[in-house]
Structure formats: structure tokens, C-alpha cells
């Protein structure tokens, strides 16, 4: 009885006339739709599509104005932070595209969501281009392009290849290393890496400013690490990957090269590549590589060796690393970032990109020379990459105070620890780099001028320090804010810096479209 009633109801429903969704020839019908067009602007069925398709300046003028202010800052200032760059318009277009809308947990061809045909295409193309950019054989190397940033990518490698409380060696943070390599003090585990793994630093030879490889080898013999990191955030010299490879082989340790800072230089082939020696290579994608904010993990695959028994031994990194990324430590990847990265990696294989990276090195060398000629003490005595690390102690001032003055005159640099510092809270150095300004078209002679502005800021900082009523940083800041003479000098230097910087092109946006373009 119930079945018969259900069938009669279904038959009645089927026999009802249906109106087309768009037109009489449309394949899609639905009886409940009104006669007028669904997206009739004058008589909309719903109101939110209009809001969703309105531009930012209409929907949120406050945020739009903040973005315009940031554009003006980038145009009028000198960006010297070595971990920053100006990515291209095409990369930003990809990052701001509809690719941000899609969820895609899993990997190409093996997703936990439907509708990923084009997401798979973008990620696969990104992987292909990543291997091509670094001239890698896809039979010997693989790459995961899903890590959200550099620190997570390093932790994903540790999680994949180590057991809890296994041992890691890496360059000490005050000597140029990075937090994600397991930094800790005598009293506190600063990085979470040092909570889950046992870490020991290797350091520079303070008499030369170069990594002390002899001491590294001795420490490794005693510590017996399972993994050694070759990578830095404030080391102006090239790594001796071959030397660390020998130490790793002796200890049967994994060699992880973290090339976050230098990957653009490596891609262009203007400095030695870690891929000849490393087992795993990580990198961020937004520093010298000049892509969107993300990261990659490269790993060896295929035949590793033939053992003493004549048996072939293969690398087992691929599955372990992929599983550590997802589902181990991440959910859905950021597909808009991966798409933007694919664009950046295509750019990284062009002649223009190599010319840019060559200029980055030339500018860095000239900048270092100009600073040295002005009496500045450079850690290691110079540079072989994109950055310089200035030890300010011989000038009688520290990085924190100089950074405050630089900020006020529109020069962006960052305070940094240098060998011999007793506190990371009062670092003795300033870290500066050339990638961002080189993207804007700066050449060697321009960095001589930048060195002059830096020197003027340091001189001003010394005057402020002399006028300070106390020895603490807050006393210095108070003098900055209250001295009419200091305010006048800052205003003059800021004006000179801005007029100089405004001569150069903007990257990613046109001056003519800026709200604050005066």
C-alpha cells in the first residue's frame, strides 16, 4: 500500500511541467525556479553574490587603505632584510586566484576530496618545475611542494626520518643558524624542535667568522647525531657540503641542507648546489627564490647503494616525508600558493632570472666593500652570498638601537646576534641583504649610496645614545621621541632616503595606480 502511494506520488511529480533554468534549450530544469533570470541584478533572488563580487575598496576601505600604505612603504623605503623580496605580478595574480577556494587533502591522483582535476594539474606541474629549476633527475629526486612554510618543513623532515629524542646537530643561532634547527639555551628550550629531539650546536671559529668544521667533526664523534643540518639564516659564507657529507657518512647520519636563504642563487647556478651531497633539501620559496610564501622538501629516491652482501638498498625517504607532511602535520595544502610557486619556478629557469641572481651577488660584494671602507666590522670579513652581517661593537652601539633609527628613516633591516653576544635580547649586529632592492633594479653604485645612508643612520644612533638619560633601550627610545634636534635629523635623513628610493621601479604594482604616490 505504502509502496503504491509512493509510486503514484513519484509519477505525479514526473508528469509536472518543468521550466528551464536558463533558456528553453537548456539541459538543466527545475520546477521550483522563478520565471525571471536567477542573477537578475534588478530583482535578485539573493543578495550576497553582489557583495562577493564587489572589489576590496568597496567592501573594506579600511583594509584597502592599509594595503595602499604598505605599497607606499615598499616604494619609498630601502628593503634590506635578506629574507625578504618583491615577488612578481604574475605570482601574485596566481596566489590571488580561484585556486584558493579548493580543498585537496592528499596528493595528485589520491585526494580525499572530489573536484581536484585542475588542482592536481597545478601541483604536478609545480613539482615538475621544481625539479627542473634545480636541474634534478626525477628518477633520483622527488619533491613535496605542500609545506606551508620553512619551519614546518624542517619539522616535517625530523618527524619523517627520526624517532623522538634522536640527535640533531645544526649551526648555533647566535652564530648564524635558525630557530627551526633546534635552538635552546642553558635554561630553556626555545625551539619546539629541542623539546622533541636532542640538539647540539656547532659554531663558527670566532677568529675567522667561518664555520669551524674541525670542531664540528669532533663534536659529532662524541654526540653521534642521526641528522646534521647544513643551513643558516645569517651566515655570509658558502657551506662546505662535501666536508659535512664526510662527517655524516662517518656517523651514518642524514645530511639535511636547509637552503631557505640561498635557493634562488642555487637555482640560478651562481653558487654551489647542496644537491650533490645532501640526502634531503628544504627551502622556503619567498626569499631569494622570489616566489610566494611557502616551502618545499626535496628528497633522494631510487638506488642508494649495493651493500656488502650484494643486495641493492633503496632510499625510503619519499613515503616517510610525504606522510609526515600529510596527514602527519598538515591537512589541506594551500593550492593558491602552490600555483603561485609554479609560476615562480618557471621564472627561475629564464635568462633574466640568472642575470638577476648574478646582480644580487655583485651588489652584495659591493655593499660589503663599501661598509668595510667606512670602518664597519663584517662577520667573516665579507660575503659570498646575498647578505652581510655587520658587527657594530667596534662602533660602540648595538643592533637594537640602530634598528630603531633605521626604521624611522625608512630603511628596513634587522638586529641580529653575532659571535660573542651574551644575550639575544641585545644583539650586537645588523643583518642586511640585497635580493629585494636588486629586484627593484639596484646595481652596484646604488648600494654604495645605500651604505652611505646606513652609515648616516648609525651616526645618528650614536648621537641619540649620547643624549639618552639611561643605559636601557627604553631610555634610547625616549630620547628618539623627545629630542627636537634628533627629530629634525631623522626627518632630513628620511626625506633623503625616500627621494632616493622613489627613483626605482615598484614591483607587483604600478606607481600610477597607487593611492599614495607622492
From Swiss-Prot:
Report the EC code(s) recorded for this entry: 2.1.2.1
Kindly state which reaction or reactions the protein catalyses: (6R)-5,10-methylene-5,6,7,8-tetrahydrofolate + glycine + H2O = (6S)-5,6,7,8-tetrahydrofolate + L-serine
Q: What EC class is this?
A: transferase
Name the cofactor(s): pyridoxal 5'-phosphate
Q: Where is the transit peptide?
A: 1-31
Residues bearing N6-(pyridoxal phosphate)lysine are 287
Q: Which GO terms describe its molecular function?
A: glycine hydroxymethyltransferase activity; pyridoxal phosphate binding
GO BP, one annotated term:
glycine biosynthetic process from serine
Mitochondrion is among the record's keywords? yes
Q: In which pathway does it act?
A: One-carbon metabolism; tetrahydrofolate interconversion
Q: Which UniProt keywords apply?
A: Mitochondrion, One-carbon metabolism, Pyridoxal phosphate, Transferase, Transit peptide
Annotated transmembrane regions: none
Domain of life here? Eukaryota
A single Gene Ontology CC annotation of this entry is: mitochondrion
InterPro entries on file? PyrdxlP-dep_Trfase, PyrdxlP-dep_Trfase_major, PyrdxlP-dep_Trfase_small, Ser_HO-MeTrfase, Ser_HO-MeTrfase-like, Ser_HO-MeTrfase_PLP_BS, SHMT-like_dom
Cell location? Mitochondrion
Cysteine disulfide links: none
Q: Which residues form a coiled coil?
A: none
Q: What family does this belong to? A: Belongs to the SHMT family.
Indicate the quaternary assembly: Homotetramer.
Function in brief:
Catalyzes the interconversion of serine and glycine.
> What's the protein called, per UniProt?
Serine hydroxymethyltransferase, mitochondrial
Q: Which organism is it from?
A: Pisum sativum (Garden pea)
Amino acid at each position: 500500500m505504502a509502496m503504491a502511494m509512493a509510486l503514484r506520488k513519484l509519477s505525479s511529480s514526473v508528469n509536472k511541467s518543468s521550466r528551464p533554468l536558463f533558456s528553453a534549450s537548456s539541459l538543466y530544469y527545475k520546477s521550483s525556479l522563478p520565471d525571471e533570470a536567477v542573477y537578475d541584478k534588478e530583482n535578485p533572488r539573493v543578495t550576497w553574490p553582489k557583495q562577493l563580487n564587489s572589489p576590496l575598496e568597496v567592501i573594506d576601505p579600511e583594509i584597502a587603505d592599509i594595503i595602499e600604505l604598505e605599497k607606499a612603504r615598499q616604494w619609498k623605503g630601502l628593503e634590506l632584510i635578506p629574507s625578504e623580496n618583491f615577488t612578481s605580478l604574475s605570482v601574485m595574480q596566481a596566489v590571488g586566484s580561484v585556486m584558493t577556494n579548493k580543498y585537496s587533502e592528499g596528493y595528485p591522483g589520491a585526494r580525499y576530496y572530489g573536484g581536484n582535476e585542475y588542482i592536481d594539474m597545478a601541483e604536478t606541474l609545480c613539482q615538475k618545475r621544481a625539479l627542473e629549476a634545480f636541474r634534478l633527475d626525477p628518477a633520483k629526486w622527488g619533491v613535496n611542494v605542500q609545506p606551508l612554510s620553512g619551519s614546518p618543513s624542517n619539522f616535517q623532515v625530523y618527524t619523517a626520518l627520526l624517532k623522538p629524542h634522536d640527535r640533531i646537530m645544526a649551526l648555533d643561532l647566535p652564530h648564524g643558524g635558525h630557530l627551526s634547527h633546534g635552538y635552546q639555551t642553558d635554561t630553556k628550550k626555545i625551539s619546539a624542535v629541542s623539546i622533541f629531539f636532542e640538539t647540539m650546536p656547532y659554531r663558527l671559529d670566532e677568529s675567522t667568522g667561518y664555520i669551524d668544521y674541525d670542531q664540528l667533526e669532533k663534536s659529532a664523534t662524541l654526540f653521534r647525531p642521526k641528522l646534521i643540518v647544513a643551513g643558516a639564516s645569517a651566515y655570509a659564507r658558502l657551506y662546505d657540503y662535501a666536508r659535512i657529507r664526510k662527517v655524516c657518512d662517518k656517523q651514518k647520519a642524514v645530511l639535511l641542507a636547509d637552503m631557505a636563504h640561498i635557493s634562488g642563487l642555487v637555482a640560478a647556478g651562481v653558487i654551489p648546489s647542496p644537491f650533490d651531497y645532501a640526502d634531503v633539501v628544504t627551502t622556503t620559496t619567498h626569499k631569494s627564490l622570489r616566489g610566494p610564501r611557502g616551502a618545499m622538501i626535496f628528497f633522494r629516491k631510487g638506488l642508494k647503494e649495493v651493500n656488502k652482501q650484494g643486495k641493492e638498498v633503496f632510499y625510503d625517504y619519499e613515503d616517510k616525508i610525504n606522510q609526515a607532511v600529510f596527514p602527519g602535520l598538515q591537512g589541506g595544502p594551500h593550492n593558491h600558493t602552490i600555483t603561485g610557486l609554479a609560476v615562480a619556478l618557471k621564472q627561475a629557469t629564464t635568462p633574466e632570472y640568472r642575470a638577476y641572481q648574478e646582480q644580487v651577488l655583485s651588489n652584495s660584494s659591493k655593499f660589503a666593500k663599501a661598509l668595510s671602507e667606512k670602518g664597519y666590522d663584517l662577520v667573516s670579513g665579507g660575503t659570498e652570498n646575498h647578505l652581510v652581517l655587520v658587527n657594530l661593537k667596534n662602533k660602540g652601539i648595538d643592533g637594537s638601537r640602530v634598528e630603531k633609527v633605521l626604521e624611522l628613516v625608512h630603511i628596513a633591516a634587522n638586529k641580529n646576534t653575532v659571535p660573542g653576544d651574551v644575550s639575544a635580547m641585545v644583539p650586537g649586529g645588523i643583518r642586511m641583504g640585497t635580493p629585494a632592492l636588486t629586484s627593484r633594479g639596484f646595481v652596484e653604485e646604488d648600494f654604495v649610496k645605500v651604505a652611505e645612508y646606513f652609515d648616516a643612520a648609525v651616526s645618528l644612533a650614536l648621537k641619540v645614545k649620547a643624549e639618552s638619560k639611561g643605559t636601557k633601550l627604553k631610555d634610547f627610545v625616549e630620547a628618539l621621541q623627545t629630542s627636537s634636534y634628533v627629530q629634525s635629523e631623522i626627518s632630513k635623513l628620511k626625506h633623503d632616503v625616500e627621494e632616493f628610493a622613489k627613483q626605482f621601479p615598484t614591483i607587483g604594482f604600478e606607481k600610477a595606480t597607487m593611492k599614495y604616490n607622492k
